[in-house]
Amino acid sequence: MESLSRAMVHYLRHNPNAPLDDAAYTSVNHIFEIFNINRCTLDNIINLPTDKQRLFLSPCHNFIRAASGHSRPVQLHLLGSPITSPSSVKYCTHGTTRKSLTLIEKEGLQKMRRHYIHFAKNKTSVKKGSDVIITLDVPKYLRAGMKLYRLDDGNIAASGNRDNVIKPIYFL
């Protein structure tokens, strides 16, 4: 089940031929065909006990998408809800490597090959292999007019400034 779940997530995130709408959803019927599964199997995959929820069904349960990490552009406001109150964010950190830290401290966090800058919702959500944690000053960031979104999986995403960068002045 776990390998099928990972294959579905990879397909929904990265397959350029996957028929996704602006919110990155595709029909569950399409998934049934592509992966030769039925509704019961899909429900079992969605409900796998894991520390990271990677797949989401639409409210009507007829569409499915990967939580985040898409290779093609997806409208951030359609992947989650805007965060307007700093008090609603308990944990907003970005995991990185010590090797990358010097450049980040100088230039800021960049989206790199992704479409958005991702932040973890808790310690277990921090990117594997991270040996440095950068914490975002959420009140200062929001006061500056920058936008944060809580994704469906609970993690947080930001586009940064017009250059897609979060400057070090917003780090704690």
What are these regions (language model features)?
Residues 1-117, 123-172:
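Conserved NAD+-utilizing ADP-ribose enzyme module
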